[in-house]
C-alpha cells in the first residue's frame, strides 16, 4: 500500500474517534512497523504525537512485522514514534517494501533456533523460562517467531500458517500465493488472543506474564483446528525490556541462563500490575484490528463459502456446489470440496500443498507413535527402529505426497535446512505443560523427543535416531511424554503443522466415484496374435468407399468425446513401425520398441487410416485405433529415448532421414499432449464393484429390484439381483437404474430385503440412512433435477388416463399407443402399452419420466410416417386416433407436455456404429442408422431383418462409435453369415446363426420364428428377450453360446477343416455363430429347458433332431452325447472322444450345460485325448478354483469314460467319492 492509497483510505473511512497516544501503540498494534531506511534515525525517543485516525487505519495492516525484521537486521529497536504525517506515510510505504525480507527473516529465525541455541539447564527445574539465548561473535539467535505474527491484521495479504522455509520462498516469489490453510475468522482470532493473553494471568499457569508458552490450546466448539497459540502480551514484555519488542530474544553476550532467570524473576513482581491492565487492552485491540482477506466470498449464493481459492468449505452440501459430480473431489486432509483436476498430488487428494505436507507429516509422526508403543512393549531396546517401517498403503501415500512436494519446490532446494548434529538441538521454552515426573525422566524424554525431531526433519523414517544417553527406564516410559512432559521446540513446531484430531469429512466423501477396476493403460492391440473375445473386425469394411462411420463427437458418453474435435486429417503422429526387420510379438501391457512418423489420412469412428512418411503410394497404408498405446504425439519417442526407425521398404530412399523429417514436420499439427490422459480419465466409471442400486426387475417391469454391481466393462455394468444369480447388463447412464431410495422417494414399487425396506420406510419421515455401499444420486445421469419440483412448486402435468404414444419397452422396434396408469412424484409416471391384453395385476406397467425422449404425443407416428402398432383389437390399416379416443372416452396428452428439444446430434442415415442389443443386453452388435426422426434414431442390426430394429434416442448410452469394443476390450458381434441352400458338403463345418427375435402370440407370449422356414436344416437359435420381459409360460434358458469358428478351425487338422462358403458375406468374421446342419426338420415340441447363461438376460432354444432328440449333437459325423439325458433304449452310436478336436470338446461342454467354461477349455486347447486325461486336481486351477463347476465337469468326464467303456459304469457308481 503506497502513501496515496493510505491517504485516500484515511479520507474516505470513518475512523474511531477515541483519543489515544503513541505510547499505547504497543498495546494497539502489537509490533510497530520498522522501515529499513530509517532504522538509524529512530534510536532516540521522540515526543509523542496524537495521530489517532491514521494509526487506527495502520493498526490492521502492519502488525507483527517489526519483530522478525529486527531479527533479520541484527539490531534491537527502541520504541518508534511517528513525529509527523510524513513519517507515518513512510512507515506505511516501507512496511509493504519489507514484506519480502520479513518472510525470509522469520523463517531464518525459526530454523536458527535449532542450529545455534544451546541446551537449557533442565536439571535445575527452570520452569517458566520463556526466552533464553546464547550467541557467539559470529551468529546471533533471534527471538521465537510469533506463530500468528500477522493475526492482528494485515490487509496486504491473508494469514498463512508457515510450515517450512519453502513456504517463505513461495510467498517471496508471489505475494498472492496461498497455501490452502484456513483463514482465521475474527471470532477465532479474538478467542485465541484472549485465551493466550489471559492464560498468563492464571494463578497456576507456568511462566511469567508476557512469556510465550506455545501451548496447544483447543479452540471452542465449531472450530475445526487446534492452533499453536502464542501469548500476545507484547505490552508486558515491552515494559520489561524497555521497548515495544519484548518478545524478541535480546542478544546478551556472556549472560548465563541462571542470570537471565533471576532477571525475569525480579521483574515479575514489578510488572504484574501492568500485565493485568494490558490483558484486556490486548483483547480489545484485537477487536479493532479484525483483518479482511483479499479473497472475496461469493455473494450470488450465500451458502457457498470459499475455503481456498480453488475449494469450498467442507461443511457445504455438495448438491449446491456448482461443480459437476464426476469432477468433484474432497480434500483428504481438511475436507474442502473443489474441482478434482485442480487439486494437488498425482492422485488429486489435497486442496493445497499445505494439506499435502500436513498429511505427510502426520503419516510420519503417527507411524513413529506406533513404533514407540511397540518399543515400550518390547524388552529389546532396539526393536523401536524395526517397528517404525511404514505400512504399504502409507508408504504409497507418503511417496505420492513427497513426489508432489519435490516437484513443487525443486526450484527452492537451496533454501532447505537440514539438522545433522544432535547436539545443536536446543530446548527453548521446553516446558509446554506441567511436569509429572522427576528431573532424570524428564531429561530422558526431552532427549528422546529431540532424537525424533532430528529424524523427522531430516525426512528419514522416524524412530531411526536413538538417544545415546537413553536408559532402560527412559525407554520404557509411555509415549504420553509428547503431551505431558517437556517437549523441545523443534517437536512443538512439528505438532503445529498437523491437527490434533481427525478433521470431520462430509458424509458423501465415501460415496464419491471410485475408479473402475480395469487396466490403467490402454494396451497394445494392433497385432495381437490371438483375440480371446473373437470380436468382429471392422477392417474389411473400413476401406469401402460407401462406408460411413458416425463421428465420435456424436456420442457424448463415449471416451474422448470432449477432445475429439482437436483431431483432424493431416495430423502427424508417431506410430509403431511394423515394416521392420524383426517382427515383435506384442503382449498386453507392453509397448513396441520401433516407431516411425505417420500422417492421418482419414478418421472413421475411433479408427484412423495412416500412411508412413516417405511412402508415395498407398501400398502400406494401414488402419489403427487412435486410442491405443501404439499411437503417440510427435516427440514422444524423444522423451523416452526410443529411436525413430524408417520402414524397411524405403530405408534407402533418403540419405538423411533427419532432414527429411524436419521438412515434413515443420508447421504440422500433432495430438494434444494430454490426449491419452483425457481418454483414460473418460474410461473410468463413476461406479465401483459392490455398490447397491435399484433397477428395473426384468421379470416384472412394473417394479424395481435391489441389485449389486458385480462387473464393469467400459462403463457397462452387470447388475445381479439381491435374491438370485440372475441379472443383466446396462450402461451406467441408462434410465432404468436408480439410486438407493429412489423408489421410496417417487412412490414406485420395490422388491428388496426386509432390512432394506425398513430402512427406506424410516427415511420417509427423516433422512435415509446411507450405507457405505449405497449408490447415491450423484452417480446417476438424469435429464432433470429434483430442485425443479421443489423450488418452483412444479407438479406433474400428466393426468391419469391420458393417451399418448411410447416406445414399447418389450419390443423396441415398435411405437404403440399407451395410457397413463398412475402419476408418481417428480415427473415420473406409470404407463401401459395398449397393444397387449390388460393385466389386472399391473405387471405390464412401465415407468417413464415426463421428459423421457421415448414418449410422444398422439399422432406423432402418423406425422412422421412411422408405422404405429395399433391397440389390442384394432387393425393397423383402419386405426385412427380420433376413433380410438372416441371409443375409449380418453383424452390425449397435449403437445406442450412433451419435451422434444432436438440437439444438433450429427447422425445421418447410413452411418455405422456399435449398438447394444437391448433385447439381449450382453451383446454389442454391428449396426447402422436406418432412419433419423428429430432426435429419434432407428438402429438396424446389420445382417438381420427389420423386426430386430430398435428406436433409440440420439443421446442413448447404448450406442457407441466404431472401434469402441476394441477400446474397452468388449466383444463385438458381427453380422450373421448367410448360408445359401446348395448341395451338402462332405464334412460340413457346424455353424450357429444368431438368435431370432420372438413374435408376440395371441396371449402376449413369445414364440420363436425363423426367416428360412422352408429350409430342412436345423438351427441353434436364440430367443430374443428384454431385461424387463415377464417370465414366460415355457421357461427357455441359454444352452449353447456364441463362439468363433475361425479359432477352432486353426486348431483342427487340415483334413478336418472345410472351405469357406464362397457366397458368404465377406464382411462377416468369426464372431458369428455356427449352424448345425442335420437331416430332419424341427418342430415346436422339441423345445427343452437348459441352464442359465451367466448373464441371465438372454434365452436360447435348442431345436433337436430325429432319433437323437436333445440327447446329443452330430458334429463332423462325430457323436457327442448329452450325458444327463442318456436313455438305454437310445440307438447306440459310435462314441470316440479320443478323436475329438478342441471344438468338439467345447460342443460336449455345451450340450451338457457347461457353456460358461467353453472358452476356458478352448484357450487351453484341450482336445478329446487331453480331456480324458484331466483329473480333479487339473480341473480346479483350470476353472479358477471354482469347486462347483469343477466337480460337475469332473463327473461328466467320468460318465464319458463309462459311456466309452460300459464295464466301468458299475465301478464308477460304487466308488464315487466326494470331490474334496
UniProtKB/Swiss-Prot annotation:
Disulfide bonds: none annotated. SUPFAM superfamilies: SAM/Pointed domain, Tudor/PWWP/MBT. Residues 473-482, 1071-1082 have a biased composition (Polar residues). Residues 1083-1092 have a biased composition (Low complexity). GO terms for molecular function: chromatin binding; DNA binding; methylated histone binding; zinc ion binding. Pfam families: MBT, SAM_1, zf-FCS_1. Residues 1140-1203 form the SAM domain. The keyword Magnesium does not apply. Residues 1052-1068 have a biased composition (Acidic residues). Residues 991-1000 have a biased composition (Basic residues). Keywords: Chromatin regulator, DNA-binding, Metal-binding, Nucleus, Repeat, Repressor, Transcription, Transcription regulation, Zinc, Zinc-finger. The keyword Transcription applies. InterPro entries: Mbt, MBT_dSfmbt_rpt1, MBT_dSfmbt_rpt2, MBT_dSfmbt_rpt3, PcG_chromatin_remod_factors, SAM, SAM/pointed_sf, Sfmbt_SAM. GO terms for cellular component: nucleus; PcG protein complex. It is found in: Nucleus. Transmembrane segments: none annotated. Residues 371-399, 464-483, 976-1024, 1050-1092 are annotated as: Disordered. Zn(2+) binds at residues 331, 334, 351, 355. MBT repeats lie at residues 536-647, 655-753, 761-871, 879-975. GO terms for biological process: heterochromatin formation; imaginal disc growth; negative regulation of DNA-templated transcription; negative regulation of gene expression; oogenesis. A zinc finger (FCS-type) spans 322-357. MBT repeats have unique discriminatory binding activity for methylated Lys residues in H3 and H4; the MBT repeats bind mono- and dimethylated H3K9Me1, H3K9Me2, H4K20Me1 and H4K20Me2 but fail to interact with these residues if they are unmodified or trimethylated. Interacts with pho as a component of the pho-repressive complex (PhoRC). Polycomb group (PcG) protein that binds to the Polycomb response elements (PREs) found in the regulatory regions of many genes. PcG proteins act by forming multiprotein complexes, which are required to maintain the transcriptionally repressive state of homeotic genes throughout development. PcG proteins are not required to initiate repression, but to maintain it during later stages of development. They probably act via the methylation of histones, rendering chromatin heritably changed in its expressibility. This is Polycomb protein Sfmbt. It comes from Drosophila melanogaster.
